[in-house]
Regions:
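N-terminal segments that cap or nucleate solenoid repeat domains
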Residues: 1-37
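A generic tandem-repeat structural signature
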Residues: 43-109, 113-116, 121-127
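Eukaryotic tandem repeat interaction scaffolds
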Residues: 104-108, 112-191
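The feature encodes a structural signal of leucine-rich repeats
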Residues: 17-20, 40-43, 63-66, 87-89, ...
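Leucine-rich solenoid repeat scaffolds
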Residues: 200-241
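Leucine-rich repeat
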Residues: 23-26, 45-50, 68-73, 92-97, ...
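Conserved hydrophobic beta-strand positions in leucine-rich repeat
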Residues: 5-7, 30-32, 53-55, 73-79, ...
């Protein structure tokens, strides 16, 4: 088994990425987290062999479109805890990527091209400023975990009904007034976290979700004596109110 070529520059107070890094085109893993980086040059596109790229905990305000040239990225891309107000459209070229974290940024939207990331299994966009998701989110047919805590999401697009592999959905601390109907047919969904929204009523179809194991409704306006909740518990679902 080939040894992965890794360059770990975590917390080196770099301020900027040394030019020498971009010449290391054999790298499989590049860790640049927590370095006070404010910009990333187009040279990032030269590292064609990268499988994992960690740019978390910096001060990046944008990411160059050349990121989309890293088509071998298959493990993880960390962009969390930066100052990103938008993501490059070229993200859609990363069809092999399995894990993407863009949490803790001031993102208000996600690019429609995200639907091209067909290999994505876990997507984290917690603590941004999202009000909804793009329709293209429904193209992520391999998605198993979706983490959206701490946004201002009022609704989910109808296309989320196509996320048939979804197991875990975190929607706590958002602005939902009803449970999104697009979840009704997701037969593999096991956990739904709806804490701290604006829910006051629940749809009957929740009791028809065959795999539902845990439903967290704390800090909403839901009446804990609703017959539906008792029914869910009899079906083996843990309900927290």
């Amino acid at each position: 088994m080939a040894v992965r070529q890794t360059l770990n520059l975590w917390r080196q107070e770099l301020g900027a990425v040394p030019e020498s890094v971009w010449r290391q085109t054999e790298l499989d893993v590049l860790i640049l987290a927590d370095n006070g980086l404010t910009a990333l040059p187009p040279d990032i596109g030269q590292l064609h062999r990268l499988k994992t790229l960690d740019l978390g905990h910096n001060a990046l305000t944008s990411v160059p479109e050349e990121l989309g040239q890293l088509t071998e990225l298959s493990d993880c891309l960390y962009l969390h805890d930066n100052q990103l107000s938008r993501l490059p459209d070229s993200l859609g070229n990363l069809t092999r990527l399995r894990y993407l974290n863009v949490g803790e940024n001031p993102l208000t939207t996600l690019p429609e091209t995200i639907g091209g990331m067909s290999g994505l299994s876990e997507f984290r966009a917690q603590h941004n400023r999202l009000t909804t998701l793009p329709d293209a989110i429904g193209q992520l047919r391999s998605l198993r975990e979706l983490w959206l805590r701490g946004n201002v999401i009022e609704r989910l697009p109808s296309s989320t009904a196509n996320l048939h592999e979804l197991r875990h959905l975190d929607l706590r601390e958002n602005s939902l007034t009803e449970v999104p109907e697009s979840l009704a047919g997701l037969s593999r969904l096991r956990q739904i976290d709806l804490r701290s929204n604006n829910l006051s009523r629940l749809p009957d179809w929740l009791a028809l979700m065959p795999s539902l194991e845990k439903l967290d409704l704390r800090w909403n306006k839901v009446d804990p004596s609703l017959p539906l909740l008792s029914k869910l518990e009899r079906l083996g679902c843990i309900v927290l109110t």
